[in-house]
Curated annotation (Swiss-Prot):
UniProt record, GO biological process: defense response to Gram-negative bacterium; defense response to Gram-positive bacterium; killing of cells of another organism
Catalytic activity: Hydrolysis of (1->4)-beta-linkages between N-acetylmuramic acid and N-acetyl-D-glucosamine residues in a peptidoglycan and between N-acetyl-D-glucosamine residues in chitodextrins
Known EC number: 3.2.1.17
Subunit structure: Monomer.
Gene: LYZ
Source organism of the structure: Pseudocheirus peregrinus
Designated name of the protein: Lysozyme C
Entry keywords, A to Z: Antimicrobial, Bacteriolytic enzyme, Glycosidase, Hydrolase, Milk protein, Secreted
Lineage: Eukaryota, Metazoa, Chordata, Craniata, Vertebrata
Similarity section: Belongs to the glycosyl hydrolase 22 family.
Compartment annotation: Secreted
PROSITE patterns: GLYCOSYL_HYDROL_F22_2
Class of this enzyme: hydrolase
Domain of life: Eukaryota
Length: 49
């Protein structure tokens, strides 16, 4: 299933992800958007990277 961007941001903020390991909430949203398009079933294997 897919989350909406604002839904993800709200949950991430509630889980104190803003600033986690120096990563801003905006950067987490960007990362999730690019890696999975907010698809909760997506798996990225990072082949050799």
């Amino acid at each position: 299933s897919k989350m909406k961007k604002c839904e993800f941001a709200k949950i991430a903020k509630e889980q104190h992800m803003d600033g986690y390991h120096g990563v801003s909430l905006a950067d987490w949203v960007c990362l999730v958007n690019n890696e999975s398009d907010f698809n909760t079933k997506a798996i990225n294997r990072n082949k050799g990277i």
